[in-house]
Amino acid sequence: MEHKEVVLLLLLFLKSAAPEQSHVVQDCYHGDGQSYRGTYSTTVTGRTCQAWSSMTPHQHNRTTENYPNAGLIMNYCRNPDAVAAPYCYTRDPGVRWEYCNLTQCSDAEGTAVAPPTVTPVPSLEAPSEQAPTEQRPGVQECYHGNGQSYRGTYSTTVTGRTCQAWSSMTPHSHSRTPEYYPNAGLIMNYCRNPDAVAAPYCYTRDPGVRWEYCNLTQCSDAEGTAVAPPTVTPVPSLEAPSEQAPTEQRPGVQECYHGNGQSYRGTYSTTVTGRTCQAWSSMTPHSHSRTPEYYPNAGLIMNYCRNPDAVAAPYCYTRDPGVRWEYCNLTQCSDAEGTAVAPPTVTPVPSLEAPSEQAPTEQRPGVQECYHGNGQSYRGTYSTTVTGRTCQAWSSMTPHSHSRTPEYYPNAGLIMNYCRNPDAVAAPYCYTRDPGVRWEYCNLTQCSDAEGTAVAPPTVTPVPSLEAPSEQAPTEQRPGVQECYHGNGQSYRGTYSTTVTGRTCQAWSSMTPHSHSRTPEYYPNAGLIMNYCRNPDAVAAPYCYTRDPGVRWEYCNLTQCSDAEGTAVAPPTVTPVPSLEAPSEQAPTEQRPGVQECYHGNGQSYRGTYSTTVTGRTCQAWSSMTPHSHSRTPEYYPNAGLIMNYCRNPDAVAAPYCYTRDPGVRWEYCNLTQCSDAEGTAVAPPTVTPVPSLEAPSEQAPTEQRPGVQECYHGNGQSYRGTYSTTVTGRTCQAWSSMTPHSHSRTPEYYPNAGLIMNYCRNPDAVAAPYCYTRDPGVRWEYCNLTQCSDAEGTAVAPPTVTPVPSLEAPSEQAPTEQRPGVQECYHGNGQSYRGTYSTTVTGRTCQAWSSMTPHSHSRTPEYYPNAGLIMNYCRNPDPVAAPYCYTRDPSVRWEYCNLTQCSDAEGTAVAPPTITPIPSLEAPSEQAPTEQRPGVQECYHGNGQSYQGTYFITVTGRTCQAWSSMTPHSHSRTPAYYPNAGLIKNYCRNPDPVAAPWCYTTDPSVRWEYCNLTRCSDAEWTAFVPPNVILAPSLEAFFEQALTEETPGVQDCYYHYGQSYRGTYSTTVTGRTCQAWSSMTPHQHSRTPENYPNAGLTRNYCRNPDAEIRPWCYTMDPSVRWEYCNLTQCLVTESSVLATLTVVPDPSTEASSEEAPTEQSPGVQDCYHGDGQSYRGSFSTTVTGRTCQSWSSMTPHWHQRTTEYYPNGGLTRNYCRNPDAEISPWCYTMDPNVRWEYCNLTQCPVTESSVLATSTAVSEQAPTEQSPTVQDCYHGDGQSYRGSFSTTVTGRTCQSWSSMTPHWHQRTTEYYPNGGLTRNYCRNPDAEIRPWCYTMDPSVRWEYCNLTQCPVMESTLLTTPTVVPVPSTELPSEEAPTENSTGVQDCYRGDGQSYRGTLSTTITGRTCQSWSSMTPHWHRRIPLYYPNAGLTRNYCRNPDAEIRPWCYTMDPSVRWEYCNLTRCPVTESSVLTTPTVAPVPSTEAPSEQAPPEKSPVVQDCYHGDGRSYRGISSTTVTGRTCQSWSSMIPHWHQRTPENYPNAGLTENYCRNPDSGKQPWCYTTDPCVRWEYCNLTQCSETESGVLETPTVVPVPSMEAHSEAAPTEQTPVVRQCYHGNGQSYRGTFSTTVTGRTCQSWSSMTPHRHQRTPENYPNDGLTMNYCRNPDADTGPWCFTMDPSIRWEYCNLTRCSDTEGTVVAPPTVIQVPSLGPPSEQDCMFGNGKGYRGKKATTVTGTPCQEWAAQEPHRHSTFIPGTNKWAGLEKNYCRNPDGDINGPWCYTMNPRKLFDYCDIPLCASSSFDCGKPQVEPKKCPGSIVGGCVAHPHSWPWQVSLRTRFGKHFCGGTLISPEWVLTAAHCLKKSSRPSSYKVILGAHQEVNLESHVQEIEVSRLFLEPTQADIALLKLSRPAVITDKVMPACLPSPDYMVTARTECYITGWGETQGTFGTGLLKEAQLLVIENEVCNHYKYICAEHLARGTDSCQGDSGGPLVCFEKDKYILQGVTSWGLGCARPNKPGVYARVSRFVTWIEGMMRNN
């Protein structure tokens, strides 16, 4: 359907659908529209009109003053000066004015109204303002004559480009505007002919094409005679004449020219070399003077070929910056044509340019391919030199500057880059385009005698050269010079001295630049005079050494003499002196037989001049080493004919070849064919014995014959031995022997029989087809672009037996083994069996190769899906999803379905798709695509369109839909993975949610989503089709993502009453401004959002009236105008449309429309109010909290707009309570500056019939719309329906008002809970708590339940309880309470008690439980905010974090928590089946995080999901270790026992997953490895139908308990990730650009919903890099407010790491600071051990052991063995405060200081070592040496003489924590020093830091703990960093695994003198308990710290770092059984520690 027909149909539809329009608004105009008075204000291109009274952005004189009767109101379309139709100036600065998008009224309308008489004020503007006066006769699709009378609406050029509007200057500035051509009909962008050229044309929207003729045809004769074109007299053009177009008719395209082409007026614009012409009016890229202004009669239009200055032929300047101008590729017309047209007389304006612009004046006699004499008369067009180089244009100075220009040689024919001889040298020549070769002779031959007598060369008198004499060439003829030679040229004695490439010969007697032995002394008879060409050693022809240092020698540019000449002169006898040079100087001896285009045999005898390879590359010269260095030179192969760059075969390979000029391709065979047999028998190839190759064997080429190119292969191609070397994507193959760019093992050494020669396609390891590694670093390998041979060929050759050397590469190198069955263009079923070669998506994108990770990293590779046919980039379905798909080459679109269709039924039954068992996907489920079929295209939808499965993808505004699987340009959660049944295929319109109609996200970044341009199916269709059941994944995206659910009523162009019910799609204001989207905050911030006004229809940017304004309005897109009323009219009020509304007519507000008020009068004074209180006129002035009201007329303390001016009927008297804007009750602003407003303390009057008022349904700022019932003193159900007025909590506290933020800030307001009845401070239950509650007025108690009781449950109450559906809260879940009802008292619990909801609140020792919402006496994080589904109500016993049973914090300050006094319920069948499903917190963001749960079988050898249901008998870990029995405590003590986990199947030692780990695991029987994952795989999807067991997914604990689930190793060091990084649990927190990550639980600077609560299983700890939503790699939000998120600077782990989970290894992470102290010093540098050996002045240091030049005796190595006095290195043996020094080598200066910088600290977090600790369970006594620097906070406390006596812990750069008893020997700080970063106790490493102690602080209550302040801060490195302090009063849970370290007594065990570690368990408080101390050890074994470790650390791992929980204090002996070690409890002293550090 044509565009115009669509427009007409749409207009008809709107006319029939819309109700009768107002008589004010006109949507059509009569005549020329002078009488039009409508309110339309949009132009034909959609631009908004500028107001007539405004001068911005366009100055004009069409104002009401100048045109008082023209109706110039606002920005409405008008016609003040009688042009063709109504128009306006636009708001777009780039477009001055346009006609309006209005149509003429029909005749019936036209006769009814006579346009008024309009007498405009005379125009005060220039005539450029005039517009055309003719009528619009309709649309014409052909034109008469030359089209000047054409007034159609066509706007497309002959090349399909869109026309630019005539009034627009973008992209082309011009003068064909309506102002200058008022009668030319220049409306919009329609094709016109304003200046009488050949046909209608227009300027184009393409910046690169100025104008083109339109794609219109001339009308037929019948049409042509019917209409006489009007007389058009255009206003004289005010533009430069350059705009003038040719005046002749358009007779067709002229492809030839007459004479010299001055009369040519065709449209050709291409030069002889194919370059595009530059426009004559353009100065880019070449500035010139041939412009239309200077040559007005030369027809210089656009970039057409012309001849303005009478040169030889039409020419033009080119678009190529390197070529100024060229002749055009036109031919002269034949004589018949030539006589028919006499060229016009052209008198050009004299040129204003330099004479260099002049072109030659001679005629173009045709192309000559030979020349006469020396070629001075040659005027052909040849432009290639003898070596194949392209000539430089004579007028160009690039790349060679010269003086042979047309200006200096005007008669030499220097046109373009044609070969010429301007200065009478030997033959035509030219400068070359090659910067390395200045000039060469051209590859032309002399004409024969017959030709020579026919043409007498002209007399050429060149202008004297202005160049340096070096440029001069000989001008005389050379009479005595021989220009040819006889035989091989040994007798040649001429004076020629130039080589074939134009180089000058070196003199034979000179050794510069080349040293040689061909001198006159050694060859006295060879005529070696000067630098003349000679042949002293009988090679093929005369040659010489060259003056070019890069080219040693070349043959001379001489030809052999003819036979006639040959008989006249007998060559002399030449006996050369034997050569003294190496044979490399030898040159070939054979004759030059001419040019051959085929070769015999293998081509060794070929002596032709062909120099192009099979791929079209140019050959490198054999004597050149650029770009490839080689040994096939004329010196080494003198008989091989290695002349210039001709194809040769010097070493007997398959065919002639050459090295190429392409640096990326070393060599290739030449594009030559073998000669036929007839030719082959005629010439016997000579015997060639080449000099042995001096190159490495890598240079060798294949030795087999070249039987022709094999372009197909047999079988799988193992026998293929062809020479093809290109992949299916066109990439060049990498040589098999090369390791660049890809290292591999498919080399000739390992596969000797596989034919791995050069880079030819091969199949060494029997994959599907020949392949190769590619030269592209981003693509490792691809199949080759070869096809299988036909059957006939296949039976003829048996592939050879190939036994490759076993592959040395990883299996990832393997390729699929299936055959290629041919090309399929349709697929069966879901396309799993498809094996075709299609590789294009539905949007036309090219597929990414499956084996490539660029641009998208993924796991669908041939390695993981070996049977899925993942060859090259062909469309496949490995998963399976709905249809074949692929990843795309477009970085912004990850994947799309392929543009394939399903095969027909006949085809479908013929092929059964194969059984495909893919390797389980290693990617996130977000990769999955929908599984439904494509049912065909539907162009209408049923109901709300949920069942629509058509293929439409255009929105109502014409935008293209974004693909559902794409996140560009809009990120979203409506993906096929989360809505698998919604049919989200490609970018088709769908309704997954469901909303009102099908919709989609758009590809326009500025418009997020729109409804699709679809209509609802007719009733007949509706009844015929039942939409399918659609089960939607619940949308968890932000509430503003939801669209309206009401039916689309169509387009409304009028509104009823105040427009509150208006749901149309109009979005323009009365001044023509575009509306801002309601959900957008740009450019205006506001609160009228869909979240706050969910029932107001705030969809997109449509006009609405959410708050009872007088009419629909919107915020505008103009930053300077906040809001305006919309350009809508009221609908005619009929009986059916009457609504009961208030009579509210306020004055228009200039601010947000919420400021409006009703107009009713005050009825008197009252103490209660009716309805919502809008009619209240009492004198009450106190709020619900007792605050006094602010006067309405006052702006203090709160500025506002509720004044009598804006609300004259609102009764705003004094400070009385009022309700001016339809709130839920009267209110006022308060006198309290901290509380803006509150509801008043008034009650509703008793509801009687007379008191019922009709109120508006809209609410301004907030509040629900339901009426308040009477007072209730009990509640039904959970109390959500309670609307009573009770406001006291269970403890008697008064409730806080819901609208108040004092004393507690919250979000339970009427905006977020409009249906929650949140009136005043009444008890309510807005969020489905277990009963009504409220915030309290007590600042110390945030909220409590109300003192209400449940109503008796009777039938009547059950039936009358209203249904209240609260709006979901958009606040953080911190406020949420459990939603389940209390089931009564439970005295037992099931499983681990996570489902327990009883009311017991007593521990096993009888202590009372602390309330979960309280922080007294124990601060904690088990609050409803973080555990919303854990039932954390009051102080009831619960198990929020998967402990072994319910527990609670206690009210006893000395006991942090205990298990509750509950027993486990008996395990019966019913109890197992009724175990509730505990689901995690549903994400309030996009549902992309949710994945479908897998089914679980009962017993199997694979596991489903995370393996919690696995009941198999596997008992081996991934590393082959045997599992420990679950009921055993040896070798690992644990709490995962059958008693504690009765439902987890903990039988024997079988692999299980009792606590929601990643997969089944077990404790191992290896004492050094606590646990590992089991060696199991996930079950395939086909097994997913087995019965599912109850799913218990607890929210993970945010606080460590004793048995943290073993879901990962302690994530201290992990700098790489596996797969896409979803499993990454390292601690890296820096992005690729170096930005720091934002904490996942923080909302600053970026608000988000990727929180630990919403993604409990994704490890969102602190600010560590993670991948919670299956992106391509770990990422994080950044701390940079301007950058929301970035990928992290992490790399993927190696393949070996990706296949198994290896035991923890020691990964040394490079320090981010200095690597050691070698390059810098700590403190005063006393410990400096670097190698600096010069002083600050640069003087060398004297060696410390030397006595010269300075004698010394104090500081020598023998007496200062600890000072490191090595060699002459700078040292500080005496602790000089100025730093290291040395004795100098200057005899006058004894010593000087060295310039050594201080070391800088690196940035490391506390408690996170950069080396993974060993965590060995042995004891220090038993000997477990720690990994060096894995406990970097360990301190060695020493005496000032260096003896170690105690340990300590670094807790900040300046502070060390140790035991107080370590400091009893001395109270002086100078007695002590500390050693940091040491691993050895005695032989200290060079990087250790030695720091003095400056102050001591003992704990004041005599606890065994003390603080040391260091004399300077320690430098934080990867070897020295602090441990973390615990939270104050934190209680370590019993059985927590902790670690002690130290160098203490080891009682003779292994590792003495090295830092040791040991693992201990914290002992229960009942066994060993004191509030100042904790106890820890293995009670049954000898593991303890000994005396030497006093003061050392006891650290426990929590979440992601090590916390210092204890300081080693004392114990009974050393590692005695049942005698635990005692440690000072650090958490008890944290307040004291922090105070000391802060105050000192």
Swiss-Prot record:
The active site is at H1861 (charge relay system), D1904 (charge relay system), S1990 (charge relay system). Residues 1820-2038 form the Peptidase S1 domain. This is Apolipoprotein(a). Apo(a) is the main constituent of lipoprotein(a) (Lp(a)). It has serine proteinase activity and is able of autoproteolysis. Inhibits tissue-type plasminogen activator 1. Lp(a) may be a ligand for megalin/Gp 330. InterPro entries: Kringle (IPR000001), Kringle-like (IPR013806), Kringle_CS (IPR018056), Kringle_sf (IPR038178), Peptidase_S1_PA (IPR009003), Peptidase_S1_PA_chymotrypsin (IPR043504), Peptidase_S1A (IPR001314), Serine_protease_kringle (IPR050759). SMART domains: KR (SM00130), Tryp_SPc (SM00020). The gene is LPA. Belongs to the peptidase S1 family. Plasminogen subfamily. Disulfide-linked to apo-B100. Binds to fibronectin and decorin. Residues 1-19 form the signal peptide. GO terms for molecular function: apolipoprotein binding; endopeptidase inhibitor activity; fibronectin binding; heparin binding; serine-type endopeptidase activity. Pfam families: Kringle (PF00051), Trypsin (PF00089). Residues 1147-1166, 1365-1388, 1476-1497 are annotated as: Disordered. Glycans are attached at residues 61, 101, 215, 329, 443, 557, 671, 785, 899, 1013, 1127, 1241, 1347, 1381, 1461, 1575, 1689. Residues 27-105, 141-219, 255-333, 369-447, 483-561, 597-675, 711-789, 825-903, 939-1017, 1053-1131, 1167-1245, 1273-1351, 1387-1465, 1501-1579, 1615-1693, 1719-1799 form the Kringle domain. GO terms for cellular component: extracellular region; plasma lipoprotein particle.
